[in-house]
Amino acid sequence: MPNFFRNGCIALVGSVAAMGAAHAEGGIAEAAGKALDSAQSDVTITAPKVMMVVATVVGVGILINMMRKA
């Protein structure tokens, strides 16, 4: 019985959130589009930093390997 109550609460919250998004300005499609745009801008900002860190780690690894062989 507790599972039915939990699942019912989850369904209720999901339906309330969907109704709120549907009645928001522009509807659910525009809200999803804005979320995707926000995620894309985050990726665009962080990708060069991640590549710099990866290149630094690889470079240090190669340097350590060369020092061991010398």
Curated annotation (Swiss-Prot):
Disulfide-linked positions: none
Keyword Signal applies: yes
Keyword flag Nucleotidyltransferase: no
Annotated Gene Ontology cellular component terms: pilus
Signal peptide: 1-24
Chief localization: other
Compartments (UniProt record): Fimbrium
Membrane spanning residue stretches: none
Keyword terms, alphabetized: Fimbrium, Signal
Extra facts: A.hydrophila possesses two distinctive pilus types: 'straight' pili appears as brittle, rod-like filaments, whereas 'flexible' pili are supple and curvilinear.
Role played: Fimbriae (also called pili) are polar filaments radiating from the surface of the bacterium to a length of 0.5-1.5 micrometers and numbering 100-300 per cell. They enable bacteria to colonize the epithelium of specific host organs. Flexible pili possess hemagglutinating function.
Record's subunit section: Homomer.
Protein name: Flexible pilin
Organism: Aeromonas hydrophila
